[in-house]
Regions:
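Extracellular adhesion/carbohydrate-binding repeat motifs centered on closely spaced tryptophans
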Residues: 1-467
Length: 467
């Protein structure tokens, strides 16, 4: 801390010129003062030139010491001159706590009086220009000692483990004392109620223009959003704005390093309270938060030209899923990891695929080949409209699709009958509908005939005659 402490002090040798029996008199190298009656002056100030000097109870001029006079405190330097408009670091001869430093700071104003607390019962800050030209605010106790660390509304220092909870202002260390305002501070905190494994015995705090810590509020600072708890610590990790939060409750995430509400894309481990199963997996997942910090959940959302889906906990979906969707809201969500997970005819879910391109998790449209239980399948997903991303149901590009999967014959079948919309179609190993076929033969030597739509008109072990 830069504290102005250089004083231009006149020495007695230059300011006291010569003294008669009345006035200043040096005896045994100690200065005394005698009034016009010849009486020695004690416990009083006397002026010489532009400077004031203190005569103690023995009539000796005081040097290098703190002087108490009429409930005010002054300091005289090594020449006995009253110090004015200066900081002084003095021995702490009356420590109140074991953790107090050996020295304390005082500031002496233009009248030489040490700044000290008023009797109003509220903290009183003094504005002082430091040696570096910066203007800062400081507070002092009733004896003029500069306060530091956490203090409350009354200007009392808070020194226990709960100081960060009971304190309202923060004034830095013992050699600092400047009130924090418009400023962040990362401060040590003992919090036995904190169960998050990320907690490292400190919190971020923000101090407003009036020096008071932000508490129990959401605040935008330099374009970033933060949520401050009851005692002013900026929240970190996962949290919801309601004590009885459910998966439907808006949730937020703030990294511990800076504690701002994440906005846009971020990657982290799911929260222990917001997503217990995901937390147990311990795998980092992608999330997306709106401008207000609210994490997108149970929704398909367009982001930077691509569509993404998020489950009920806000995790970005990656892979093949069956979803029940209503106006971009996801009502149900199940990952398809095996053929047993595929939706059945009549199910309300539709199949979507997220990934498979340069943007991880982006909704896939058009055709793609996917592996399910070691088998390769061709899927086709709608490219536009309200059903964008859904797997096709029906005939598209000369093939039949069911929940996006192309229906086709196995290689060892060559041809296969497919039931669709009340009709029986014939498809090959590429899923192509076989139209206008005459006696097409499958791997079992069974013959088929189809019409112009590919609907089977004949099936048998014998060729159909040309009659």
């Amino acid at each position: 801390m830069l504290i102005p402490c250089a004083a231009a002090a006149l020495t007695l040798g230059s300011s006291m010129m010569a003294f008669a029996a009345t006035g200043w008199l040096q005896e045994d190298e100690i200065w005394h003062y005698y009034d016009r009656n010849g009486d020695e002056v004690t416990s009083s100030w006397k002026k010489s030139g532009n400077d004031w000097f203190w005569l103690d109870e023995d009539g000796e001029m005081a040097v290098s010491q703190l002087v108490e006079d009429n409930d005010n405190y002054y300091y005289v330097d090594e020449s006995g001159v009253m110090v004015r408009n200066q900081w002084r670091e003095l021995e702490n001869d009356d420590p109140q706590d074991d953790d107090e430093p050996d020295t304390v700071w005082y500031y002496f104003g233009a009248d030489g009086k040490a700044y000290k607390a008023k009797d109003s019962g509220r903290v009183n800050f003094k504005t002082i220009v430091r040696a570096d030209g910066a203007t800062k605010k400081y507070a002092f106790d009733e004896e003029g000692k500069m306060l530091y660390g956490w203090i409350d509304e009354q200007g009392e220092r808070q020194t226990g483990d709960d100081a960060w909870q009971t304190g309202l202002y923060y004034l830095g260390g013992p050699d600092d004392g400047a009130m924090r305002s418009h400023q962040w501070e990362r401060l040590d905190a003992v919090d036995d109620d904190q169960t998050n494994d990320e907690f490292q015995d400190w919190y971020w705090f923000y101090f407003n223009a009036n020096g008071k810590k932000a508490a129990d509020t959401k605040k935008t600072i330099n374009g970033r959003k933060y949520y401050f708890e009851e005692y002013g610590n900026a929240r970190f990790s996962w949290y919801a704005t309601s004590s009885n939060a459910s998966v439907a409750t808006p949730s937020f995430y703030s990294p511990i390093q800076d504690s701002w509400m994440s906005v846009g894309w971020f990657k982290t481990v799911p929260g222990e309270n917001t997503d217990p199963a995901g937390y147990s997996d311990g795998e980092e997942r992608w999330y997306y938060a709106e401008k207000d910090g609210d994490v997108v959940k149970s929704r398909i959302k367009k982001i930077n030209g691509s569509y993404y889906a998020f489950d009920e906990y806000g995790k970005m979906l990656e892979g093949l899923y069956k979803l029940e969707v209503s106006d971009k809201d996801i009502l149900s969500c199940t990952e398809i990891e095996s053929e047993n997970d595929l939706p059945e005819d009549g199910d309300t879910e539709e199949v979507y695929y997220f990934g498979g391109n340069s943007k991880a998790g982006a909704m896939k449209t058009g055709t793609t080949t996917l592996d399910i239980d070691g088998e390769r399948y061709t899927y086709n997903f709608r490219k536009s409209g309200d059903e964008r991303g859904q797997g096709y149901n029906g005939i598209e590009d000369g093939a039949i699709y069911e929940k996006g999967k192309r229906l086709e014959a196995d290689k060892d079948e060559k041809l296969k009958k497919v039931e669709w919309d009340g009709e029986t179609y014939l498809v090959n190993t590429s899923g192509k509908i076989q139209k206008n076929k005459k006696n097409a033969k499958d791997a079992d030597d069974r013959y088929y005939c189809t019409d112009s739509k590919g609907i089977v008109t004949y099936e048998g072990m014998e060729k159909k005659s040309e009659k």
